[in-house]
Curated annotation (Swiss-Prot):
ATP binds at residues 219, 221-223. This is Chromosomal replication initiator protein DnaA. Residues 175-391 are annotated as: Domain III, AAA+ region. Residues 1-90 are annotated as: Domain I, interacts with DnaA modulators. Residues 91-174 are annotated as: Domain II. Domain I is involved in oligomerization and binding regulators, domain II is flexibile and of varying length in different bacteria, domain III forms the AAA+ region, while domain IV binds dsDNA. Residues 392-511 are annotated as: Domain IV, binds dsDNA. It comes from the Bacteria. Plays an essential role in the initiation and regulation of chromosomal replication. ATP-DnaA binds to the origin of replication (oriC) to initiate formation of the DNA replication initiation complex once per cell cycle. Binds the DnaA box (a 9 base pair repeat at the origin) and separates the double-stranded (ds)DNA. Forms a right-handed helical filament on oriC DNA; dsDNA binds to the exterior of the filament while single-stranded (ss)DNA is stabiized in the filament's interior.
Length: 511
């Protein structure tokens, strides 16, 4: 069974899956051929369990279809193809923590020459330990506090500046936003896995996944989760050396250390923390000296059992200008996508924020805002603050009419960006059909289903009435549009393909 066949099938699967699913679960897999057997390596137990439950069946189908009809012999293992000798797999704490949320059954081993797969537990491997890790340097005679220059403007709002005395003259300053906790983080389908992973790391330090890498667009909650982990670690151990910073702060500290001839003190500082939380790691791109120093710091921390949490606006392997050895190491732990919140989660976020602000927000008002502000949580909260301020200054209760007044410029922009014409064009491109097909009388499934999806999106994303939507879809009756919307809502619950299609199109149209 050739590696080339596997790669061919993976490329076919790439076309079937949303990019974030493919990047999170399939791309980290490594493969090597051992005689007639394919050995597929997952970076950790959690990825192994998820791939086995969700994707292995389809992969085997593709291998059979493109392997001259022969059932492939395949083993799914934990580890790396570069590992010389498999070792026993560690426990899977996150799988247990997230089992209720994800309904994923833990798999102790996987092997197959048919769809049902099971591998001897002894054959399951884990990544080899870090080799050739740079030793901790002794501090220089000059005292160097990397975080001393961080001003209040550089720290998050309401952040707590907190110092912990360590060996010698070094001090660790942690700028953690105390308002970012697990308790006030609104969980939904879009962030369920990320939240479970972050909680596992926070509640079981040194026994969770290391590093934890969260990626996704701006304003989706990555930084909130990172601060929540730090706050929980300090709650459990007030003397813990937890350092949060933006990647640019790390670069600035290194430059300062070089200028002061205090690079050894810099190394000692960052390699003696209990947890290092770095935001927006993509800013390391094309900064070779910074990447070199972070590479050795990262190795030293993992070798010492200290926790590392990183965030980025994209999947780590897609960060251009980042060294391959760093990308590889980021995959040693767990990499999780944080996606834009779905409608129900957006409503829940608004209701929770209103409750925290002690403001009466009617559910229909929250629903109205959530329907129109879809890109990220930050914009959602900003819109709510404008509405609350408008309500306060005008001395009026929050109603849909007041929301229209306070957000009129934002709503006008949204209406301009999301039109029925744009929806039709986007849906036609997605399903590889013509716009004229959507407007035609054709009833074949390949055309009717995309047409129903486009109608449902038009109802959700625009302010047009059902008759108006029907009119721009070839003069159809409003009852046809209503049926299409109900049908798509039903299919979103029962058909995973339609659910993913709708989510992808919604993301494309609103970001």
């Amino acid at each position: 069974m050739s590696v080339e066949l596997w790669q061919q099938c993976v490329e076919l699967l790439r076309d079937e899956l949303p990019a974030q699913q493919f990047n999170t679960w399939i791309r980290p897999l490594q493969v090597e051929a051992e005689g007639d057997e394919l050995r597929v390596y997952a970076p950790n137990r959690f990825v192994l369990d998820w791939v086995n439950e969700k994707y292995l069946g389809r992969l085997l189908e593709l291998l059979g279809e493109h392997g001259q009809g022969m059932a492939p012999a395949l083993s799914l293992l934990i580890g790396s193809k570069r590992s010389s000798a498999p070792r026993a797999a560690p426990n899977a704490p996150l799988a247990a923590a997230a089992s209720q949320a994800l309904s994923a059954n833990s798999v102790s081993s996987v092997s197959s020459s048919a769809p049902a797969m099971a591998t001897p537990a002894a054959a399951v491997a884990v990544p080899a330990p870090v080799q050739n890790v740079a030793a901790h340097d002794e501090p220089s005679r000059d005292s160097f506090d990397p975080m001393a220059g961080a001003s209040s403007q550089q720290a998050p709002a309401r952040a707590e500046q907190r110092t912990v005395q360590v060996e010698g003259a070094l001090k660790h300053t942690s700028y953690l936003n105390r308002t970012f906790t697990f308790e006030n983080f609104v969980e939904g389908k879009s962030n369920q896995l990320a939240r479970a992973a972050a909680w596992q790391v926070a509640d079981n330090p040194k026994h969770g996944y290391n590093p934890l890498f969260l990626y996704g667009g701006v304003g989706l909650g990555k930084t909130h989760l990172m601060h929540a982990v730090g706050n929980h670690l300090l709650k459990k151990n007030p003397n813990a050396k937890v350092v949060y910073l933006h990647s640019e702060r790390f670069v600035a500290d290194m430059v300062k250390a070089l200028q002061l001839n205090a690079i050894n003190e810099f190394k000692r500082f960052y390699r003696s923390v209990d947890a290092l939380l770095i935001d927006d790691i993509q800013f390391f791109a094309r900064k070779e000296r910074s990447q070199e120093e972070f590479f050795h710091t990262f190795n030293a921390l993992l070798e010492g059992g200290q926790q590392v949490i990183l965030t980025s606006d994209r999947y780590p392997k897609e960060i251009e200008g980042l060294e391959e050895r760093l990308k590889s190491r980021f995959g040693w732990g767990l990499t999780v996508a944080v996606e834009p919140p779905e409608l129900e989660t957006r409503v829940a976020i608004l209701m929770k924020k209103a409750d925290q602000a002690k403001v009466d927000l009617p559910h229909d008002a929250a629903f109205f805002i959530a329907q129109r502000i879809r890109s990220n949580v930050r914009e959602l909260e900003g819109a709510l603050k404008r509405v609350i301020a408008h309500s306060h200054f005008m001395g009026r209760d929050i109603t849909i009419e007041l929301i229209r007044e306070s957000l009129k410029d934002l709503l006008a922009l949204q209406d301009k960006l999301v039109s029925v014409d744009n929806i039709q064009r986007t849906v036609a491109e997605y399903y590889k059909i013509k716009i004229s097909d959507l407007l035609s009388k054709r009833r074949s499934r390949s055309v009717a289903r995309p047409r129903q999806v486009a109608m449902a999106l038009s109802k959700e994303l625009t302010n047009h009435s059902l008759p108006e939507i029907g009119d721009v879809f070839g003069g159809r009756d409003h009852t046809t549009v209503l049926h299409a919307c109900r049908k798509i809502n039903e299919l979103k619950e029962s058909d995973a393909d339609i659910r993913e299609d709708y989510k992808n199109l919604l993301r494309t149209l609103t970001t």
